Amino acid sequence: LINLGIYDEVKETLEKNGKSLAEIEEIELEPSLGNGGLGRLAACFIDSIATLGLNGDGVGLNYHYGLFKQVFENNLQKETPNPWITKESWLTKTDITYPVSFGGFTVQSRLYDIDVVGYNNRTTKLHLFDIESVDESIVGDTIDFDKDDIKKNLTLFLYPDDSDDKGRLLRVYQQYFMVSNAARLILAEAEAKGSNLHDLADYAAVQINDTHPSMVIPELIRLLQEKGILMDEAIEIVSKVCAYTNHTILAEALEKWPISFLEKAVPQLMPIIRELDNKVRAKVADESTYIIKDGLVHMAHMDIHFGYSVNGVAYLHTEILKNTELNNFYKLYPEKFNNKTNGITFRRWLMSCNPELSAYITELIGDGWKKDANELEKLGNFINDDAVLTKLVDIKNAKKAELASYLKKT
């Protein structure tokens, strides 16, 4: 409503009819697509892309139950499914569908879209792929389900329990399902715009947000080979298309999968991954940078070697990556490393969450900040203004009281 410019009008109309926006917000279910750091960042990316009018979309999976809903019974935590998909949801079913092959079986995908409205600008899309054969009935009152039945469970839960091999293997299936669909959608859109695929980098850029989508690199190479492009050129093309965002300073926390998992789930990718590893070994002496090592496939290593950019998400984080944790890679590719400091969409976290503070900021510096966050620096002019500081504290206290009241109710 804020981005459409009709928030105040809708609020006023509801109040005239004895309703409030807060009541409506409680009725509408929040999409259970990931509310952690990566999910929040992805949502902010898409809002920013739409607001800036850039050509960009998000791609993910249409998780039916998200992570879980936390309830307390007898003073103990209990995890239950968190369903959100209803006929009133913002999901739009499309005609786009692809067969996705795993080791020994194939599933059929279906693309659903959610429109993301920019602030006084364009609308972009969040593409969410689902499987046609998903079966919610295999989930009961808890978050336990048959992890072996991939044809039914693939898109049920975000981050399925990975305390055993079945859960970890399910994550591999999920990751490949996402990137295989995304890669084909990207190639189809590029061809529709006139690309001959040899020039794919002129039509597409793929941002690998942490290592979960890393298999998009070998999958794009595989699909380009299916289109008649030879392996070496396909690798060169993909290396100009893919970029990697790192979110951890601990090298040991970087995602790596047992070769046996990939050979079982996505055997078609292993020859390509082995060839990528061979190319690294042919030009690099440092064994710590190899893609395949000790029976594991190191996803971040593949991203760094065969992507055009590697960024951290804060200045200090990026410096640590360059100087310690990924220093061996930095020595190989100093030109690839750069910093992109994480931000937030202040339209959600300020204008939506705190309209009183937003109104006061506009009163002080005008409304240019709503599209350009740099305008907020003008608030520095009031750093010694007691009246302004008192007003800010009053607003803050009022919002704390609102939060306390909400927490008491829930």
Model-derived features: where do they sit?
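A conserved ligand/cofactor-binding region detector
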Residues: 1-410
